[in-house]
UniProtKB/Swiss-Prot annotation:
<dbReference type="GO" id="GO:0008831">
    <property type="term" value="F:dTDP-4-dehydrorhamnose reductase activity"/>
</dbReference>
<dbReference type="GO" id="GO:0019305">
    <property type="term" value="P:dTDP-rhamnose biosynthetic process"/>
</dbReference>
<dbReference type="GO" id="GO:0000271">
    <property type="term" value="P:polysaccharide biosynthetic process"/>
</dbReference>
<dbReference type="Pfam" id="PF04321">
    <property type="entry name" value="RmlD_sub_bind"/>
</dbReference>
<dbReference type="GO" id="GO:0005829">
    <property type="term" value="C:cytosol"/>
</dbReference>
<comment type="pathway">
    <text>Spore coat biogenesis; spore coat polysaccharide biosynthesis.</text>
</comment>
<keyword id="KW-0560">Oxidoreductase</keyword>
<comment type="similarity">
    <text>Belongs to the dTDP-4-dehydrorhamnose reductase family.</text>
</comment>
<dbReference type="InterPro" id="IPR036291">
    <property type="entry name" value="NAD(P)-bd_dom_sf"/>
</dbReference>
<dbReference type="InterPro" id="IPR005913">
    <property type="entry name" value="dTDP_dehydrorham_reduct"/>
</dbReference>
<keyword id="KW-0521">NADP</keyword>
<protein>
    <recommendedName>
        <fullName>Spore coat polysaccharide biosynthesis protein SpsK</fullName>
    </recommendedName>
</protein>
<dbReference type="InterPro" id="IPR029903">
    <property type="entry name" value="RmlD-like-bd"/>
</dbReference>
Length: 283
């Protein structure tokens, strides 16, 4: 039985990965941040040496964009050095290595979907720390798989969908930016693609649901699919006043995954399923 070690197993993607891996018949080693500190090489070496996985999926990350600006050391340690240690120790034991990255490694000023080989030009500490992770991985091994994704949401996590639904409980209207464009990604679809890519050549892949929207359109869809009457008001990024800059354009090209035979469903269809599952779980 193929043994897969998942870092960040307590996060929304890690939870879904572990669930699907078990269903697919893999032996799963689910490591949370309390069980292994990816920024501590001795901790990583001990865990990898003890479990001897065939495949490592590094889904551990410090993803709070605003907090990364305040805690630079933590951001670079987890997203940069942690990626290096997990890649290095995977190589040492001969394990296949898969790393989850982000659209934030690009500058967000594009007008066409970002291709896998487009130059990296991050504008935030979060993006810069994730770029460092990618660079260190590529220096460590040529056989890694790096999967960039965007606008991720899923069960058991803190995300945009859950934030909107929580705010809708107490507010009659919500202000949401309409000039930031991207593609939402449901963890169920992301995890499915990650597992499929185990059997494809190493390299860089972009995975998100298909279709594009603004955060305003995404929020409107959340309310419509949930049957809620909370009004969504369109505002610009400048009017909203984020402390940390957000990419205006985050759409990722699916060229590589389509060549691998992976064609993600539309984001609205994925959102509908997520909300239905969420509702059923609450009944």
């Amino acid at each position: 039985m193929t043994k897969v070690l998942v870092t960040g197993a307590g996060g929304q993607l890690g939870l879904e990965l572990c669930r699907q891996l078990k269903q697919a018949g893999y032996e799963v080693i689910a490591l949370t941040k309390k069980m292994m500190n990816i920024a501590d090489q001795r901790s990583v070496r001990h865990s990898f040496g003890h479990y001897q996985p065939d495949i490592v999926v590094n889904s551990a990350a410090f993803t709070s964009v605003d907090q990364c600006e305040k805690e630079l050391d933590k951001a670079y340690l987890i997203n940069g050095i942690g990626a290096y240690y997990t890649a290095l120790e995977s190589t040492r034991i001969g394990a296949q290595y898969v790393h989850i990255s982000t659209d934030y490694v690009f500058n967000g000023k594009g007008t066409q979907p970002y291709r896998e080989d487009d130059p990296l030009d991050p504008k935030t500490i979060y993006g810069k720390s994730k770029r460092l992770g990618e660079e260190l991985i590529r220096l460590t091994t040529k056989d890694s798989t790096i999967i960039r994704t965007s606008w991720v949401y899923g069960h058991g996590g803190s995300n945009f969908v859950e934030t909107m639904l929580k705010l809708a409980e107490t507010k009659q209207e919500l202000r949401v930016v309409s000039d930031q464009i991207g593609s939402p990604t449901y963890t169920k679809d992301l995890a499915e693609a990650v597992i499929k890519l185990f059997s494809h050549p190493p390299g860089i892949y972009h995975v998100s649901n298909s279709g594009i929207c603004s955060w305003y359109e995404f929020a409107t869809a959340i309310m419509e699919e949930s049957g809620l009457e909370t009004a969504i008001l369109s505002v610009t990024t400048e009017e909203y006043g984020n402390k940390t800059p957000r990419p205006a354009y985050s759409v990722l090209s699916h060229r590589a995954i389509e060549e691998a035979g992976i064609r993600p469903r539309h984001w609205r269809e994925a959102l509908r399923e997520y909300l239905q599952e969420r509702s059923s779980a609450c009944d």
